[in-house]
Design a protein with these regions (language model features):
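General marker for long, soluble alpha-helical cores
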Residues: 105, 121-128
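Short acidic, glycine/serine/threonine-rich loops at helix termini
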Residues: 18-22, 92-95
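Acidic, His- and aromatic-enriched active-site or binding-groove loops in soluble protein domains
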Residues: 24-53, 101-112
Length: 298
């Protein structure tokens, strides 16, 4: 319905959707919503290996392969690494680039610098694995799109109608402060945004004469606001590595139990390929199938 709405799909979940319900996508993200920011913050690749999570399971090539199989196409689509539970540190960006991603989606914590006027949210970061483009969400518009008020004092933003009115007013203000400047601003919806809310926002944005709705490719190709080999991140949203480590240890223990069971009790009924398939990634694919079958997800 809204051609300007850009959908970035998790290819694992995308392939489980019935073909007649799959949305048109602007690109795919890392499979299984793998948390690259937590991976870099934990800085323990062996912990992931012990848990049965290989780098090859979530790189850009695998994302493209899963999408191509689901769509029965040889035409590649764009790949984006989506921000996880923490911030995009230089280490996280380097890992994403090494995994084949040339662009990442970041929330407003990516750049801690405060500027007087709004600017294009495109950054280029030089990493040891190569340059990577960061598409940063604009803070106020993103907060409102996520269904949140911009401050505790903004009582008028307690309802969807109030937040939508503020969103339009805010975007008009940005246009008036620099009427002849072209700036590319990113706004995303949260994972629990309802279809009704998304429809309201997109309908209003499409009717706003002062806005020109473009796409992620256009933003990625825009002149970057900053080109640097450093990241000026806001650490207030740092990844909780303790939870990640606990989860990995649990996965590792479960994987050992499963493999032990497969090799000792079920040895006659399984070959080596069957045993190697008993890992968290296989479980993730089953989870994707289960999740995709639920109808209450917007």
């Amino acid at each position: 319905k809204h051609h300007s709405l850009q959908v970035v799909a998790d290819p694992l979940y995308f392939q489980e959707l019935p073909s007649d319900t799959r949305p048109a996508v602007a690109g795919v993200m890392q499979p299984g919503d793998f948390d690259v920011t937590a991976y870099a913050a934990l800085n323990d690749a062996d912990a992931y290996t012990r848990a049965g999570i290989a780098d090859e399971a979530w790189n850009a090539e695998q994302a493209q392969t899963l999408y191509a199989v689901a769509k029965s196409t040889v035409t590649p689509t764009a790949t984006y690494a989506w921000q996880g539970s923490g911030t995009w540190s230089l280490d996280a960006l380097t890992k994403a680039r090494a995994q084949g991603y040339t662009a990442v989606i970041a929330d407003s914590t990516f750049d801690g610098e405060q500027t007087d006027t709004v600017h294009t949210g495109t950054y280029v970061v030089n990493t040891s694995a190569g340059d990577i483009t960061v598409l940063k969400e604009q803070s106020e518009l993103g907060t409102l799109a996520h269904g949140e008020a911009t401050s505790a004092r903004a009582t008028a933003e307690a309802s969807d109608a109030g937040r939508l009115a503020r969103m339009l007013a805010q975007s008009a203000f940005y246009q008036m402060e620099q009427p002849y400047a072209t700036r590319n601003l990113l706004m995303t919806f949260s994972r629990n945004s309802s279809a009704s809310w998304i429809n309201q926002v997109m309908s209003a944005m499409e009717q706003a004469s002062w806005l020109n709705l473009t796409d992620l490719n256009t933003m990625a190709a825009a002149d970057p606001y900053s080109v640097s080999s450093e990241v000026n991140q806001d650490d207030s949203n740092a990844a909780d590595v303790s939870q990640t480590r606990a989860t990995l240890e649990q996965l590792s223990s479960s994987r050992k139990d499963i493999l032990r069971l497969a090799t000792s009790i079920l040895k006659k009924g399984l070959d080596e390929d069957d045993v190697s398939s008993l890992n968290p990634q296989a479980l993730a694919r089953q989870d994707a199938s289960s999740t995709a079958s639920h109808t209450n997800d917007p």
